[in-house]
A protein has these predicted regions:
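Active-site groove signature of glycoside hydrolases
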Residues: 275, 337-368, 415-430, 544
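SH3/SH3-like beta-barrel fold
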Residues: 197, 209-214, 222
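Glycan-recognition patch characteristic of GH18 chitinases/ENGases
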Residues: 231-341
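Hydrophobic faces of well-ordered beta-strands that scaffold small-molecule active sites
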Residues: 248-252, 271-276, 309-313, 354-356, ...
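Substrate-binding surface in catalytic domains of secreted glycosidases
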Residues: 283-293, 340, 366-491
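Short, acidic/polar
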Residues: 253-269, 332-348, 398-407, 522-536
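Primary recognition of N-terminal secretory signal peptides and signal-anchoring hydrophobic helices
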Residues: 2-206, 228, 233-240
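Glycan-binding loop/region signatures in secreted carbohydrate-active enzymes
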Residues: 464-531
């Protein structure tokens, strides 16, 4: 009897201990869950600093400086504007202004006057740029029209919300009171609460969950079934390309003292762009026209042949213009004057674009030439015009090659034209090819890999000429003559053997001329076909041809 009672007591104690252990386990789980929930739940109060939401992304952590709010105006630092909107934003010391460009707009805003100039037109502002603690701040609301953005500041959440007006935006209506979660997990932070009937921005909607942005700028997830009436409130806006196929451009050069060529009866099958040498910079930095009645007839001929017209704007390309070009590039005022002149002639003659052909520049002016292109590009885009820029091969002398920042030019301009000729040119003391295949391909690879230029923006410029080199018995170059492709057969004696060079992908000839030796690396249809193959192989934007 006693043993039975003890056994019953022992069993009862075991059950109690088990119940106690179970209660302890449940309590521990409950504490852990509550702790997790408490940790995962965000109190919907004010933030200590202002958040920045751009196109439905919270980029606050990427801010270089805190957002500044003074007297009701919101300022972003120059560094942050550069990070989020205009990587080429620029402080001009000469005029004491901030210069910023974006798409079709270029704007100037100073540090004293409440004025902003956009594409040459002034308008009043509520404030101006400021310099505080060695940081330049610019009022973001004054740049709405420049960056094409919508700005909303929600004081209750300290969220600065910026939307690009050229990007798609979808909206929906909340169908039931809901909590917005930080993730799609069952237990997740609550970032906001929304009521039935509230309008939200739909960022994505898939697999039963919608990522949304609330009216006060909070971003999170809600079950898809809790939103209705999803509509596209704004479509993506993309600028149409003037030429959708490959560019086939022909430079049509004539000197400053000559008249435009008469092309009345000229057939140009396959060519879709012509670039006559209509414009030059004089020694004072002014844009000079060389069009006249012959040029007007040329324009009419080009249009009748369905050709776009991108005339050259040249700085003459000789060393005498180096100082003038440098003075223009080193002054924002002079750059702006030249840009206005270019825009005016584009409007006057109803041009489709221009081709910048600046050569023989100082290496130290490289960045300023890029600035000129950065500042010109939005004015061209405003009118729907194409900006193409000629550059030489990546390796070479300071004034011939190293004066170009090909990466920036390729990024900003519609097209960058690689003048893949004069490998051995007028200044060469050694005989050689005008445009060897291996040299051209090496240059292209540098454009694509080192300079990181989009292949579709690169136009390959090829020569329709070569040179006849004359050497003495010691190999010294005595003279060199430019020979047009159409005159090559009449220049080389008929009994001279043409040898194919598979590295250069062209024929080579060498023959005696008395005690001297003539050499020529021939440009013909076969050598051109080899180079044209690079356009399709590397998916380039097209072809440009130069004839001397």
């Amino acid at each position: 009897m006693k043993h039975a009672k003890e056994a019953k007591t022992l069993k009862s104690n075991v059950i109690k201990r088990r119940r106690m252990a179970l209660l302890i386990i449940v309590a521990i789980i409950a504490i852990l869950v509550l702790a997790y929930i408490a940790n995962e739940f965000i109190i919907l109060g004010k933030n200590k600093t202002t958040n920045l939401i751009i196109n439905n992304r919270n980029v606050t952590e990427n801010l270089k400086k805190n957002i500044l709010i003074q007297n009701g105006e919101i300022y972003l630092s120059k560094q942050d504007l550069g990070n989020f909107f205009d990587k080429y934003i620029y402080e001009d010391k000469e005029t004491e202004q901030i210069i910023t460009t974006y798409n079709k707009k270029i704007a100037e805003i100073g540090f004293e006057k409440n004025i902003i100039t956009i594409n040459g037109s002034e308008k009043s502002t509520y404030t101006h740029a400021i310099n505080q603690d060695d940081t330049i701040y610019i009022p973001i609301n004054e740049l709405k029209d420049v960056y094409n953005i919508e700005i909303n500041y929600i004081e209750s959440t300290k969220n600065l919300v910026i939307d690009s007006l050229n990007k798609e935006q979808k909206k929906a209506v909340v169908s039931a009171n809901s909590s917005i979660k930080s993730t799609k997990k069952f237990i997740a932070k609550t970032v906001a609460r929304v009521k039935k009937g509230e309008c939200v921005i739909v960022i994505s909607n898939e697999n039963g969950y919608a990522k949304i942005r609330t009216e006060d700028g909070r971003i999170g997830y809600i079950k898809s079934k809790k939103i209705d009436n999803e509509v596209t409130a704004r479509q993506n806006m993309e600028q149409e390309k003037q030429i959708t196929n490959k560019v086939n451009l022909v430079w049509d050069y004539y000197s400053q003292v000559a008249s435009a060529p008469d092309r009345t009866d000229t057939q140009i099958d396959g060519v879709n762009v012509v670039s006559p040498s209509f414009f030059n910079i004089d020694k004072y930095g002014k844009l000079i026209e060389n069009i006249g009645s012959r040029g007007q007839a040329y324009l009419e001929w080009a249009r009748q042949n369905d050709c776009k017209i991108w005339p050259m704007v040249q700085n003459s390309g000789d060393s005498t213009m180096m100082d003038t070009t440098s003075k223009i590039m080193n002054s924002y005022t002079k750059r702006k004057e030249l840009i206005e002149s270019i825009i005016n002639v584009c409007i006057k003659y109803k041009l489709d674009g221009i081709n910048l052909d600046f050569e023989n520049m100082r290496k130290e002016d490289k960045d300023l030439y890029s600035r000129f292109i950065i500042e010109l590009e939005p004015r061209m885009k405003e009118l729907g015009l194409v900006l193409s820029v000629d550059v030489t091969a990546p390796d070479g002398s300071d004034t011939w090659s190293l004066c170009f920042d090909r990466h920036v030019i390729g990024d900003v301009a519609d097209y960058i034209i690689f003048m893949a000729y004069d490998e051995y040119g007028e200044s060469s003391t050694k005989s050689g090819t005008t445009s060897g295949y291996d040299w051209v391909e090496l240059g292209l690879k540098k454009f694509l890999d080192t300079e990181e230029i989009e292949p579709g923006k690169i136009i390959l410029g090829v020569p329709l000429y070569t040179r006849l080199w004359t050497e003495d018995s010691s190999g010294k170059v005595l003279k060199k003559s430019v020979i047009s492709m159409k005159d090559i057969d009449n220049t080389i004696p008929s009994d001279v053997e043409r040898k194919w060079d598979d590295k250069l992908k062209q024929y080579y000839v060498e023959y005696k001329d008395g005690n001297n030796t003539n050499k020529m690396w021939i440009e013909d249809l076969k050598s051109l076909k080899e180079k044209l193959g690079l356009i399709s192989e590397y998916q380039l934007g097209g072809l440009a041809s130069w004839e001397k």
